[in-house]
């Protein structure tokens, strides 16, 4: 169950481990079940109830018990532009559809029990008349259609090398401010020297 950081805080979900050593860094929280209205928690209907209780806008920590049979995953702020994972893709797709920013994600398995990979998934989608997209497609869409850098302000600065424009930009994905010192007018048709300081 992919959830935002805000939703994990709302539900008081702690990370499953203090130090995540998995290769993909998937941010598992402690597992959950509904506090009321289920039996063992393992049936499809019990899991569905747990998911619906967890994503409810008014959900409280007391609506859930831990551990359980649903494994919430905390998405990175910034979505697939900060971490190209299934968790973030689920949240980003829900936001693009103007839905609650949460998503149930699953792995599709082949008949032989192995995990379906891209070619298998393309065949599965065709067989069942499903649309399919990749995380790379989503990253491309977001880079093309969403603004990730915002200009905050501009001022002039006098230095021993002359007058410069000092412009502040904010990276809205990582919430970092970057400063640009610009001298003179930059023409779109001409290349200019750029130096980056870290």
Predicted feature residues:
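Catalytic domains of riboflavin
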Residues: 1-198
């Amino acid at each position: 169950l992919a959830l935002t950081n805000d939703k994990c805080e709302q539900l008081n979900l702690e990370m499953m481990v203090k130090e995540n050593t998995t290769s993909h860094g998937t941010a598992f929280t402690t597992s959950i079940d509904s506090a009321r209205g289920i039996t063992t928690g393992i049936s499809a209907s019990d899991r569905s109830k747990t998911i619906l209780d967890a994503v409810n806008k008014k959900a409280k920590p007391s609506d859930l018990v831990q551990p359980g049979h649903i494994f919430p995953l905390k998405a990175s702020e910034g979505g697939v532009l900060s971490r190209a994972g299934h968790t973030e893709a689920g949240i980003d797709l829900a936001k693009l559809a103007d839905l609650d920013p949460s998503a149930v994600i699953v792995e599709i398995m082949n008949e032989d029990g192995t995990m379906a990979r891209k070619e298998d998934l393309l065949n599965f989608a065709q067989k069942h008349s499903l649309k399919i997209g990749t995380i790379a497609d989503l990253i491309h869409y977001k880079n093309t259609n969403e603004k990730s850098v915002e200009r905050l302000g501009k001022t002039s600065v006098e230095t021993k090398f002359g007058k410069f424009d000092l412009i502040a930009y904010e990276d809205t994905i990582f919430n970092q401010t970057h400063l640009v010192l610009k001298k003179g007018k930059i023409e779109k048709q001409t290349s200019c020297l750029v130096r980056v300081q870290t």
